[in-house]
């Protein structure tokens, strides 16, 4: 149990630092803002054109999630490409299986219409 002491100390210290950083603004902040200009959104010196908290279309979220998912796989390609001359046939075919799963996933998204912007 003693070998986990540094991890526990690290977790306690990080929790304390997080709580302190969350609590300090409440101690020093004031709610005496009676000016409505201070509560409005700032748009590069111009008067705001509309509400700053407007809703986004769900397609933006879908495209961003798809981008994150398929962009994350690029992080697997780089170590594989760097160590391609050192891995054996199993490493090569496992990456080919991974690429096949990615290809099937992108075909599925394409057929479902997630990539079409209507």
Swiss-Prot record:
One of its GO terms (cellular component) is mitochondrial membrane. The chain crosses the membrane at residues 9-29, 62-82, 87-107. Core subunit of the mitochondrial membrane respiratory chain NADH dehydrogenase (Complex I) that is believed to belong to the minimal assembly required for catalysis. Complex I functions in the transfer of electrons from NADH to the respiratory chain. The immediate electron acceptor for the enzyme is believed to be ubiquinone. It holds the Pfam family Oxidored_q4. It comes from Zea mays. Belongs to the complex I subunit 3 family. It is a multi-pass membrane protein. It is found in: Mitochondrion membrane. It catalyses: a ubiquinone + NADH + 5 H(+)(in) = a ubiquinol + NAD(+) + 4 H(+)(out). Its main location: mitochondrion. Its EC number is 7.1.1.2. GO terms for molecular function: NADH dehydrogenase (ubiquinone) activity. Keywords: Electron transport, Membrane, Mitochondrion, NAD, Respiratory chain, Translocase, Transmembrane, Transmembrane helix, Transport, Ubiquinone. The keyword Ribonucleoprotein does not apply. This is NADH-ubiquinone oxidoreductase chain 3.
């Amino acid at each position: 149990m003693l070998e986990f002491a540094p991890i526990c100390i690290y977790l306690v210290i990080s929790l304390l630092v997080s709580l302190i950083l969350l609590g300090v603004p409440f101690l020093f902040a004031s709610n005496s803002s009676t000016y409505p200009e201070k509560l409005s959104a700032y748009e590069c010196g111009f008067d705001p054109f509309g509400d700053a908290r407007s809703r986004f279309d769900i397609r933006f979220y879908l495209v961003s999630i798809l981008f994150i998912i398929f962009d994350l796989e690029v992080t697997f390609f780089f170590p594989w490409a760097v160590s391609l001359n050192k891995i054996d046939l199993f490493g090569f075919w496992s990456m080919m299986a991974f690429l096949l799963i990615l290809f099937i996933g992108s075909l599925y998204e394409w057929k479902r219409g997630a990539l079409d912007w209507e």
